[in-house]
Amino acid sequence: MKESPVIKLRELLNLLPHRYPFLLVDKVLSYDLERRSIVAQKNVTINEPFFVGHFPEAPIMPGVLILESLAQAAGVLLGLVLENDRNKRLALFLGIHKAKFRQAVKPGDILTLSAEFSLISSKGGKASARACVGSQVAAEGELSFALVDKKSLD
């Protein structure tokens, strides 16, 4: 694994197509291309736009956005693996299997996002992913992605 923080926001913007308010990864703490694994971080603040309606009296991060943050962290690793191809191809989130939500994520929490790929091919990939607050698992599941040519989306 590399020293932390390996990838900060400016470089993340080159690896992910997402932008505010939908960019849900703040930095990459470590990654290992040989092991196909990554650890990233999302600082959850009260200023997140989703807290306006989810839920004003007791704000918690929507579970689907925790899963999206995991998918984005995994997407960063795919971007690093694709390196020369990433300007031509896009990783699309295909599905989530065995998703479990175990703990609420609240303003002020630091969400640690971990993913390890069991498969990366020219067509896509599969990864096991886990989001934690401290040592407590908040959500986990198996993610699948398709790699498509950006031109095919026009």
Swiss-Prot record:
Active-site residues from the entry: H54
PANTHER family named among the record's database cross-references: 3-HYDROXYACYL-[ACYL-CARRIER-PROTEIN] DEHYDRATASE (PTHR30272:SF1)
SUPFAM superfamilies, A to Z: Thioesterase/thiol ester dehydrase-isomerase (SSF54637)
Organism name: Chlamydia abortus (strain DSM 27085 / S26/3) (Chlamydophila abortus)
GO molecular function annotation: (3R)-hydroxyacyl-[acyl-carrier-protein] dehydratase activity
Function text: Involved in unsaturated fatty acids biosynthesis. Catalyzes the dehydration of short chain beta-hydroxyacyl-ACPs and long chain saturated and unsaturated beta-hydroxyacyl-ACPs.
Gene that encodes the chain: fabZ
Predominant cellular place of this UniProt entry's protein: cytoplasm
Keyword annotations from UniProtKB, A to Z: Cytoplasm, Lipid A biosynthesis, Lipid biosynthesis, Lipid metabolism, Lyase
EC class (word): lyase
Pfam hit, one: FabA
UniProt-recorded name of the protein: 3-hydroxyacyl-[acyl-carrier-protein] dehydratase FabZ
NCBIfam families assigned: fabZ, PRK00006.1
Keyword Cytoplasm: yes
Family of the protein in this entry: Belongs to the thioester dehydratase family. FabZ subfamily.
Entry's EC annotation: 4.2.1.59
Source species, domain of life: Bacteria
Catalysis: reaction(s): a (3R)-hydroxyacyl-[ACP] = a (2E)-enoyl-[ACP] + H2O
Gene Ontology terms: cellular component: cytoplasm; membrane
Localisation: Cytoplasm
GO BP of this protein: fatty acid biosynthetic process; lipid A biosynthetic process
